Amino acid sequence: MRLPYILALDQGTTSSRAIVFDQDGVVRSVAQREFTQIFPQAGWVEHDPEEIWASQISVAVEALSRAELRSRHVAAIAITNQRETAVVWDRETGRPVYNAIVWQDRRTAGFCDQLKAAGHEEFVQQRTGLLIDSYFSGSKVRWILDNVPQARSLAERGRLAFGTVDSWLIWKLTSGKLHITDVSNASRTMLFNIHTCQWDEELLRLLEIPASMLPEVRSSSEVYGTVQTSLGLESIPIAGIAGDQQASLFGQRCTSPGMAKNTYGTGCFMLQNTGERAVPTSNRLVTTVAWKIGDVVEYALEGSVFIGGAVVQWLRDGLRLVRSSGEFQELANSVKDNGGVYVVPAFVGLGAPHWDQYARGGIFGITRGTTDGHVARAALESIAYQVADLLDAMQRDTGVPLPELRVDGGAAANETLLQFQADIMGVPVVRPSVTETTALGAAFLAGIAVGLWSDPQVIAKMPVEQKRFEPRMGSAEALALRHQWEKALSRVKGWEEA
């Protein structure tokens, strides 16, 4: 007998997670497993698709076990995933032809420059809502076709399949019966027309990608099929798909135009719901599909920062300044301010609203009085400064001041960060008590599809406990700090440009 539980698979950049939710949106169990980050060259980031699959299926089974549930009890599986990351596999063997090229990967920066120089940027933005950048999937697929032996010939014979991580997981869950994605993930590929909600033939010709490689595009909330594997999840309906940031927007109940959220993950991602209108940007954000439920497509403005919480990983694993995230928090709180130090974590370039793929990281303002605490504090504050830059750009595009910013993600547990975020923006920051909003958003989408909830309005009215951080800093002090941040930003731009 199916019970009112949703199993959400949350496949992220550094770990695979599975969360069981009940009908009230309460977490009943969580399982998580990190997987290998592969760095073959400077600026290259890869994952092993088979390891992604193995880690995801293992945590799914573990989460059910912890909740004392069997597959027959689960109403539906929901899938949310790191977006833009490109997987290409052989339909006949089911094996990837190359590692997944991760959204952070910059190997195609030169190719993207060629597209811009040839005058394609306006056309691409009009069709996709995106800027030409190696961040998005299209150029990654082109690289695989051009650089993996026999890949192009196999693709032209219809042997190869491309998908974002959701497509790969669903292919594996259904033993190759379904090759699908949803509109939110498709809109991140640089191959998808967000106005017609179809793959764009002119874009495919521009990037020389055969249409036969592409998954079928479906809505974000429907029963797509059932699990076909015998790994403990058999026969569960697969009923909701959304890219991680769109899922987070839905999980934060930002279901009305004008509402916005920011996720502090490996990167930072701010989205604002713009309703059924795809709002064009003049401030180097991107226009993206938020979700499709039934026949209604909703859109969002988005700004993406490449390095957010990952700056803490760098201090831990790269500089070895701390041994754990808890130790980082203590170090950052050991000083009252940044001591004039600014960290710009442009390790893989700068995302929105700057879009400088040749920027590189820097630390500025160091004196003999600088301590490790100041560096840690500056690293923490760098996350907030980047988010403030996104907020400014978003408000310029919409012309509407944001009344509050809803937040989630791992670093949202850091109250020092959230208070500084409110201070530097001059806007209240609101954190829900349950920060699993990405998985929750996907669970809501799946639950609507199988009838646990009737529509988004019901979900928007569900009670949410939250903590609110009001701005305390004076505007003059905030402006002075922002000025120094902007000065540091200007130093790192174009660092590696030829």
Curated annotation (Swiss-Prot):
CDD domains: FGGY_EcGK_like. It catalyses: glycerol + ATP = sn-glycerol 3-phosphate + ADP + H(+). Glycerol binds at R83, E84, Y135, D244, Q245. InterPro entries: ATPase_NBD (IPR043129), Carb_kinase_FGGY (IPR000577), Carb_kinase_FGGY_CS (IPR018483), FGGY_C (IPR018485), FGGY_N (IPR018484), Glycerol_kin (IPR005999). Pathway: Polyol metabolism; glycerol degradation via glycerol kinase pathway; sn-glycerol 3-phosphate from glycerol: step 1/1. Inhibited by fructose 1,6-bisphosphate (FBP). HAMAP family: Glycerol_kin (MF_00186). Keywords: ATP-binding, Glycerol metabolism, Kinase, Nucleotide-binding, Transferase. ATP binds at T13, T14, S15, T266, G309, Q313, G410. GO terms for cellular component: cytosol. SUPFAM superfamilies: Actin-like ATPase domain. ADP binds at T13, R17, T266, G309, G410, N414. The lineage of its organism: Bacteria, Pseudomonadati, Acidobacteriota, Terriglobia, Terriglobales. GO terms for biological process: glycerol catabolic process; glycerol metabolic process; glycerol-3-phosphate metabolic process. Sn-glycerol 3-phosphate binds at T13, R83, E84, Y135, D244. This is Glycerol kinase. The keyword Lyase does not apply. It is an enzyme of class 2 (transferase). Belongs to the FGGY kinase family. One of its GO terms (molecular function) is glycerol kinase activity. Its EC number is 2.7.1.30.
